[in-house]
């Protein structure tokens, strides 16, 4: 390691080594559309049930008439300073895509980029151990991985899962009159930006961390409810962005009750201090034309990029009570934030 490398692990603040943080690093939806617009002939496989033709959380491949294999990957730059916690959050976030399809994870492979001439290998080891801890909590092995020398720290997973095809849930299959439920509060981008701006109080340091380290394993149980018509997780594109994917995929309009959207404790206090991540502005610039007129305050909430955010569930009114009972049984507050309806205008989202 060069003389410029940091020698004291206690003095290292990982967020100072990255230009972005967590899922706020994601390329904006508008730019991503350009990147994915391939000029090559379309290759099809009848066994690929979910691929990049839709904007879903993971790919699903039909193994036989009963079982599908789920494949996903997710990685990002540090969103917290502590290496172990960073690894745990990154892994929890990556595994979430399996749960968001209604599946269960089977194994994971680590993805590591590390500035070897700036940060000690021992710090990278703590990051990987954090990822291993999240995998253990999900009941899977961290079975291998790949690493490169990179200018900024990067960590994540490629995760393989399985799904009973009868339980497969997608983000574009919602139906009119479905009710919308959210399983985690919004505000992770606001609180982590407060940390990066050195405004986060010590007593608030675990609020976002605790939310980001919570596995979305409830998704595998939610998927068994027949009246759940669509399922996705809320991550870097914010609540509005992922809700738009649900609406546009199913050609529906969402009636969103903004007052019902749950917020992390102290999120509004830090928002008032100007703790708005750059990803919020990129998100709004990408899809704001599909939203109703919003105040700056409303934009900051709806477009706030989440890292390891909660699940967004579209459920029929007939199955709503079953979903509520399931969430209550797992100590998850059931919060209905709106509903879906047949469009009467070009608006994808309206506030009610």
UniProtKB/Swiss-Prot annotation:
Keywords: ATP-binding, Kinase, Magnesium, Metal-binding, Nucleotide-binding, Selenium, Transferase. GO terms for cellular component: cytoplasm. Pfam families: AIRS (PF00586), AIRS_C (PF02769). Mg(2+) binds at residues 57, 97, 233. GO terms for molecular function: ATP binding; magnesium ion binding; selenide, water dikinase activity. It catalyses: hydrogenselenide + ATP + H2O = selenophosphate + AMP + phosphate + 2 H(+). ATP binds at residues 26, 54-56, 74, 97, 145-147. Its cofactor is Mg(2+). Coiled coil: none annotated. Binds 1 Mg(2+) ion per monomer. The record marks 26 as: Important for catalytic activity. It comes from the Bacteria. It is an enzyme of class 2 (transferase). GO terms for biological process: selenocysteine biosynthetic process. Its EC number is 2.7.9.3. Transmembrane segments: none annotated. The active site is at residue 23. NCBIfam families: PRK00943.1, selD. Synthesizes selenophosphate from selenide and ATP. Belongs to the selenophosphate synthase 1 family. Class I subfamily. HAMAP family: SelD (MF_00625). Homodimer. This is Selenide, water dikinase. It comes from Shewanella sp. (strain ANA-3). The gene is selD.
């Amino acid at each position: 390691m060069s003389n410029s490398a940091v020698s004291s692990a206690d003095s290292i603040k990982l967020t100072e080594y990255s230009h972005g943080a967590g899922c706020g690093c994601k390329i904006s939806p508008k730019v991503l559309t350009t990147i994915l617009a391939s000029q090559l002939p379309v290759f099809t496989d009848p066994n690929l049930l979910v691929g990049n033709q839709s904007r879903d959380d993971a790919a699903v491949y039909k193994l036989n008439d009963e079982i599908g294999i789920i494949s996903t990957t997710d990685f990002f730059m540090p969103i917290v300073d502590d290496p172990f916690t960073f690894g745990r959050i990154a892994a929890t976030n990556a595994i979430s895509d399996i749960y968001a399809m209604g599946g269960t994870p089977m194994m994971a492979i680590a993805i590591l980029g590390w500035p070897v001439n700036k940060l000690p290998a021992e710090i990278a080891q703590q990051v990987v151990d954090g990822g291993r801890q999240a995998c253990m909590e999900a009941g899977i092995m961290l079975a291998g991985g790949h690493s490169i020398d990179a200018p900024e720290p990067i960590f994540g997973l490629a995760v393989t899962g399985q799904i009973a095809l009868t339980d497969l849930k997608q983000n574009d299959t919602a139906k009119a009159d479905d009710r919308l439920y959210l399983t985690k509060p919004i505000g992770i981008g606001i609180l982590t930006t407060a940390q990066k701006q050195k405004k986060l109080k010590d007593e608030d340091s675990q609020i976002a961390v605790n939310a980001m380290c919570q596995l979305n394993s409830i998704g595998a149980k939610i998927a068994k409810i027949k009246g759940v018509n669509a399922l996705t997780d809320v991550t870097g594109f914010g609540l509005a962005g992922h809700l738009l994917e649900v609406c546009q995929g199913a050609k529906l309009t969402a009636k969103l009750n903004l007052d019902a959207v749950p917020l992390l404790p102290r999120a509004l206090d830090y928002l008032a201090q100007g703790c708005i991540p750059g990803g919020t502005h990129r998100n709004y610039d990408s899809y704001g034309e599909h939203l109703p007129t919003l105040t700056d305050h409303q934009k900051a909430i709806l477009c706030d990029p989440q890292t390891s955010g909660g699940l967004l569930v579209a459920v029929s009114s007939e199955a709503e009570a079953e979903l509520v009972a399931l969430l209550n049984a797992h100590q998850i507050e059931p919060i209905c934030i709106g509903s879906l309806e047949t469009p009467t205008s070009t608006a994808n989202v309206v506030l009610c």
